[in-house]
Amino acid sequence: MRNSLIIALVFLLSMTCHAQKISMLDLVGKTWVADSGYDGCGNIDWNIVFSAKSSEHKFVGKSDNKVNVFTYNTYLCSYSPEKYEASLLGNTYGKYIVFERKYTYKGKEYEDFFCGEILSLESNRLTIRMKHSTILFIAK
């Protein structure tokens, strides 16, 4: 019985450690530069600057220096949502980061979202697991 209680206590403590919540304030005020793990990292530089409710994503072609800048509505969430939830815009705590994309490409308007799990955040390192990759960002 005593061993069962100890195992249960260890399990609960480990769950608490894994339930790390990130604050949007930890992301704001820095330029996060994608270092590795994303599609096109050999061809494109990717930087993100966060504000309380949005994020600016800057993509620069390494061969032609072509710049594309997109601003996405952004919020943090405690769970991985199935769709973008506008009512959560402004939510500043959570383990998942959600981006709403609205953009025009070749004259046609598009809208979708993507979500990533924040695996770790240190003062100058951010690791996000996206659908098909794990991306490391370095703060500059």
Spans of model-derived segments:
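Positively charged n-region of N-terminal signal peptides that target proteins for export
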Residues: 1-4, 20
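Sec-dependent N-terminal signal peptides
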Residues: 4-15
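Bacterial Sec-dependent signal peptides at the C-terminal "C-region" and cleavage site
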Residues: 15-22, 137
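N-terminal helix-cap/turn-to-beta initiation motif at the start of protein domains
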Residues: 19-33
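Start-of-domain marker
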Residues: 29-59
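Contiguous, well-ordered beta-strand patches that form the walls/edges
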Residues: 37-41, 58-123
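Broad, structure-driven detector of short, well-ordered beta-strand segments within folded domains
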Residues: 45-52, 70-73, 137
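Short, exposed beta-strand-loop hairpins at the edges of beta-sheets
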Residues: 116-139
